[in-house]
Amino acid sequence: MGRGKVQVRRIENEVSRQVTFSKRRPGLLKKAHEIAVLCDVDVAAIVFSAKGNLFHYASSHTTMERILEKYDRHELLSEGNNVIEEFPELEGSMSYDHIKLRGRIEALKKSQRNLMGQELDSLTLQDIQQLENQIDTSLNNIRSRKEKLLMEKNTILEKKITELETLHTCIRASPTKAAAPPACNTADAFVPNLNICCGDSGEPETVTAPLGWTSSNNGLPWWMLQSSSNGKS
């Protein structure tokens, strides 16, 4: 006859319960490890003893924190899906979108904290490498943008310098204005030489004003007055 089915129920004796827990706990964690390795899945096992002691296991390629975060996101999405199954008319509504986006928001906040160098203890080596690559890419983009802005600023400054040099060259090359001749204060400031008579040889004779002559004699030129005096004599 085969062995009958063992009924699973709470062990009444406290000592027996503790002994049974100590014997079966390693087997539970071992089974969790085996299924994680054989099936390449994320497995997490959390056990608290009757005295409050914690025993846990997480797949070697991840951490307990990341598995719990994935669990929380899944629960949020499952909650939204359950609401839609019960109330299909809510699909696409703000309530459904809010429920569905809560997990994404939490994941983005976590990623942002990691980028700021916070809460890194829960990251694996692979996560750290991915985070480092993201930071390097961000720094390269920032440097490229900075260099572009500096080049644009230098171009503007060079253009202004060229304009100033051109203006300076034009000012230096422009001719200076000639000084205006002094104005004559009297009508006799310029006394012309007039050929108005002939000498004994018949050649024109140049007649000039006598020394000390002024225009005070009735405002007439000296040669007219001289002609008048000669006629009288």
Curated annotation (Swiss-Prot):
Tissue-level expression? Expressed in developing seeds and seedling shoots.
Q: What is the lineage of its organism?
A: Eukaryota, Viridiplantae, Streptophyta, Embryophyta, Tracheophyta
Gene Ontology CC annotations of this record: nucleus
- State the function annotated in the UniProt record: Probable transcription factor.
Which molecular function terms from Gene Ontology are attached? Answer: DNA-binding transcription factor activity, RNA polymerase II-specific; protein dimerization activity; RNA polymerase II cis-regulatory region sequence-specific DNA binding
Protein name listed in UniProt: MADS-box transcription factor 20
**Which InterPro entries is this protein grouped with?**
MADS-box/MEF2_TF, MEF2-like_N, TF_Kbox, TF_MADSbox, TF_MADSbox_sf
- The chain positions of domain K-box read 91-184
